[in-house]
Amino acid sequence: MAVNRYMHNPLKYFKLHPDVKTPKFATEGSACFDLHAFIPDGTEVVTYDTWGDYRKVEVNKKLSLTKGTRALIPTGLIFDIDEGWSVRLHSRSGLALRAGLVLANAEGVIDSDYVEPVFVMMINVGDRHQTLSNGDRICQGEKIMSYYYGLEEVNEKPLKKADRDGGFGSTGAK
């Protein structure tokens, strides 16, 4: 008998509009669920250009992103995340590879105490204008158990733990 893995401690969500696309796993083996852009006619989207200048752009089911433009893409969802959990947002590999559209903050983190509309912070790192349409899959979400830990200041510099110097490639390429 098959076990429905999706019903164990489900992630609850609220749709701000009936036309918001339901987040879902693309396949039985998908580790993450897909989130969609919710940009119907008249939606205002917050953007920042390459100079960091803020603008609100009214869109009509499509949003054009020029090279270097960052945008807060609405999903039309509010998550109800259980205490002790968070949702992590990741770029979609195909969108990143083919269109150069990635999460501007590398990974989005939605804490359990955030109960406001979810936006996806995207940037066009490609050389061409890219267009997002209402309903497009824009990122992947993953519900993660939070591990709580304290922070403790120490009075002595930590000792070297391995034979390496520095970071950023310090262990070599091969």
Predicted regions and their residues:
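DUTPase catalytic domain/fold
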Residues: 1-174
